[in-house]
């Protein structure tokens, strides 16, 4: 089977959607090496990120080729790519980050899209109206045009159902994977050294992610106050003005 992916996040995003996209491709190519994996991205992006894709004969990167497509890579990603996929006789397209090209169904190309969240609809006050409109259109169209939707959580599944009126039968909840590094044992002396360095005493919850309002870290802090047990929160991520709250 020849499987094509929207690989923009693979080459452009170091965290979040990029990590998810790279994990999916690496895991599939490792577990199912008999298939062909073609990664389509509007630009080469960052070399360091491309190198995080494990080198295998079955995995290859593809970029815009025609002059027009090179001049307008965003347009190529949303529409021109379909022509390329048809010529390549792709068996399946997977939009890894909330979007798929137009006219896939009309060209006989089955499609799957991963929807990560609809936070711009659940917390609209955190987004500009123009951004909400663009996201809503893109995400909803991807859900309507795809043959199957992957939701990374049950909450995302419910949001897709409620906001876009998509039947649950079209949605599969597939939780995100975990990098192999988290399966490596850590020596006790290393743990002690980290605790001492950051003055950590007792049990704690580790939060990894940007410290901003839409992540709702404040709710976690408030919830811990209601517990009798003394548990700390260790937050690792980019600081924003939200931090002072």
Region spans (language model):
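Carbohydrate transferase catalytic cores enriched for Leloir-type hexosyltransferases
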Residues: 1-245
């Amino acid at each position: 089977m020849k499987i094509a992916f929207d690989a923009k996040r693979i080459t452009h995003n170091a965290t979040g959607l990029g990590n998810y996209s790279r994990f999916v491709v690496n895991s599939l190519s490792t577990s199912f090496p008999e298939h062909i994996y073609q990664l389509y991205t509007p630009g080469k992006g960052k070399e360091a990120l491309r190198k995080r894709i494990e080198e295998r004969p079955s995995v290859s990167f593809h970029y815009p080729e025609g002059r027009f497509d090179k001049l307008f890579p965003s347009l190529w990603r949303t529409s021109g790519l379909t022509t390329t996929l048809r010529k390549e006789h792709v068996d399946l397209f997977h939009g890894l980050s909330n979007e798929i090209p137009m006219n896939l169904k009309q060209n006989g190309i089955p499609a799957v899209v991963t929807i990560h969240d609809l936070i711009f609809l659940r917390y609209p006050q955190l987004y500009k109206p123009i951004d909400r409109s663009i996201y809503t259109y893109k995400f909803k169209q991807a859900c309507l045009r795809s043959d199957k939707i992957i939701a990374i959580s049950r909450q995302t599944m419910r949001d897709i159902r409620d906001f876009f009126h998509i039947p649950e039968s079209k949605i599969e909840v597939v939780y995100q994977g975990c990098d192999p590094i988290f399966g490596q044992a850590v020596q006790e002396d290393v743990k002690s050294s980290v605790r001492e360095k950051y003055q950590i005493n007792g049990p704690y919850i580790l939060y990894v992610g940007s410290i901003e309002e839409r992540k709702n870290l404040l709710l976690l802090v408030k919830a811990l106050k209601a517990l009798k047990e003394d548990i700390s929160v260790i937050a690792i991520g980019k600081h924003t003005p939200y931090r002072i709250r």
